[in-house]
Amino acid sequence: MARDYPLERYRNFGIMAHIDAGKTTCSERILYYTGKSHNIGEVHDGAATMDWMEQEQERGITITSAATTTFWERTENGTEPDSEKHRLNIIDTPGHVDFTIEVERSLAVLDGAVCVLDANAGVEPQTETVWRQADRYKVPRMVFVNKMDKIGADFFNCVRMIEDRTGARAVPVGIPIGAETELEGLIDLVTMEEWLWQGEDLGASWIKAPIRDSLNDMALEWRAKMIEAAVEMDDDAMENYLMDGAEPDVPTLRALLRKGTLAMAFVPVLGGSAFKNKGVQPLLNAVIDYLPSPLDVVDYMGFKPGDETETRNIPRRADDDMAFSGLAFKIMNDPFVGSLTFVRIYSGQLRKGDNMINSTKQNNERVGRMMMMHSNNREEIDEAFAGDIIALGGLKNTTTGDTLCDKSDPVVLETMTFPEPVIEIAVEPKTKADQEKMAMALQRLSAEDPSFRVETDIESGQTIMRGMGELHLDILVDRMKREFKVEANIGAPQVAYRETIGHEVEHTYTHKKQSGGSGQYAEVKLLITPTEPGEGYSFESKIVGGAVPKEYIPGVEKGIKSVMDSGPLAGFPVIDFKVQLLDGKFHDVDSSVLAFEIAGRMGMREGMRKAGAKLLEPIMKVEVITPEDYTGGIIGDLTSRRGQVQGQDTRGNAIAIDAFVPLANMFGYINTLRSMSSGRAQFTMQFDHYEPVPQNISDEIQAKYA
């Protein structure tokens, strides 16, 4: 069977934004207008289709990126289509900082993105974070300025903010007519017409009209800016425009705007209000006009499984005749089907019952059930093609970031990097019956979410959950209760401290043990040096002339590494140092790998104490947005939390305060902030770097953990 839709009519795109900009509402409207969803789900009623976990519906935020497939016929007048049906695969990504990892995963498999802004707040901190992530994955994007019906909505201020904050060139292609309660429609700068929404049929019908006189000058001014950006994409068009003042016709103009968007030379901007159902159809048209199809994307370069240099020299592209390859970018537990693995197919075809290999883990997998997802409704399918985003049921060993491919032509597409967790809590099952359920729940949740780690504390035997923030762990604990029916006691959140060394030191350690028969003997001379923050650990042997035989050197490193998990001050992991093995002595009979391992371990422990071991704490980048009246109090409070205020600037009618604050002092901050600002201020924070802990606090922590 052949594919139903040619690749040029595919659009794989994500919807990304700051929390509360209206991302999920936009996705809902898209599903409504494209006929996938028969009633419109409202986030504030807890009924949005894309937010399908109970907690998402209760908290009104999106946690997991739901992938959904829908179809759109481009239309200018709302009644007859002017293009054939396009297939849209949409991924709704979370906007809360604790879930940046979800965004990271979905960006890896998208071709394009729509960035949704709040017309009042503009480019917010999380928008910048996501924008930078999208830059890293080279994802072409366009902007939809949402909530134009809100008080204080300002489209042109948003356009300025895009340029100031992200450095991208913003090119409006559609300008809202009116704002706040006066929002009537939008000016299409490409065709120079007004779109005016009619009546109360949820924005499904509109009329096109010539631009009214009062708006004509403004429209011409912005159209000229748009054309200038567009003609830069083609020498002939530019020459005609500059020499003869000849403007490109509508199809040429769209083609040039598309070329510039794909080259990331600029970002098309439109405005509207998803909640009021105004501006969603022009947005869908723009997705088709300007965002890439899988054919517009450069070849995805992978590397050969087992290649340690990871030389990316194996191309994969959207071609059905190539060998099959796909990337598993998300795992979800579906209450009815069990574990579902979301896969983006980069090349080739996949059929039900096919055998394939997981080249990341070198395991075989078999395709059991194959589904096309619509939020959380599923449609069983028998085959899928390059460019599709599908869900597979029944995969045994595949986790997020793994490559699935044809056995005869294996490739590894991606090695996703996931941030280290900065906050941890201890969990204990309430009853014996809960214990087994909890182990299964934690295993499933950590398979779904690589930024969540589960460890057992060696000394206390407690189970430790580690994550990216309070909200992240809150929701995971909540899911354990709901989805897996586990009752557990939760400890207070703890900070993930680290240890490092203050200065370089040379240390010799001799391990001698005589107890009748053959004894143990090993001597090592170590040079322990601090490295730059974030550089991590390295080991190097400088042994010449066999002072320590080759076969014993791995023992020394093993001993050194065993100290890294539990530093000398308070038992926290040790980071950012390097060790050189300078010299040593051995005994023909009494030396062994074990003896050198013990010497390495003890030498490292003593050496670290001599090297001025220091305790490090995670420092968070905090941004508080507050009405001006509360600024003084909030800055005072941040300073009292050992925060360093970096500056403040005006954001609309509010003030944004930037600061670095130790995580240890940020627990429960949301409650303090709410009471200080009568609930009007909000904040976001994300991990930035590690810094040494002041001595008096370090002493307290050491006493507590000793």
Swiss-Prot record:
Alphabetical list of InterPro entries matching this protein: EF-G-like_DII, EFG_II, EFG_III, EFG_III/V, EFG_IV, EFG_V, EFG_V-like, G_TR_CS
A Pfam family assignment: EFG_III
Gene Ontology CC terms, in alphabetical order: cytoplasm
Gene Ontology BP, a term: ribosome disassembly
Main location: cytoplasm
Keyword line: Cytoplasm, Elongation factor, GTP-binding, Nucleotide-binding, Protein biosynthesis
Keyword Protease tagged: no
Residues engaged in binding GTP: 17-24, 92-96, 146-149
Keyword Lipid metabolism: no
GO molecular function: GTP binding; GTPase activity; translation elongation factor activity
Family, as annotated: Belongs to the TRAFAC class translation factor GTPase superfamily. Classic translation factor GTPase family. EF-G/EF-2 subfamily.
Protein name as catalogued: Elongation factor G
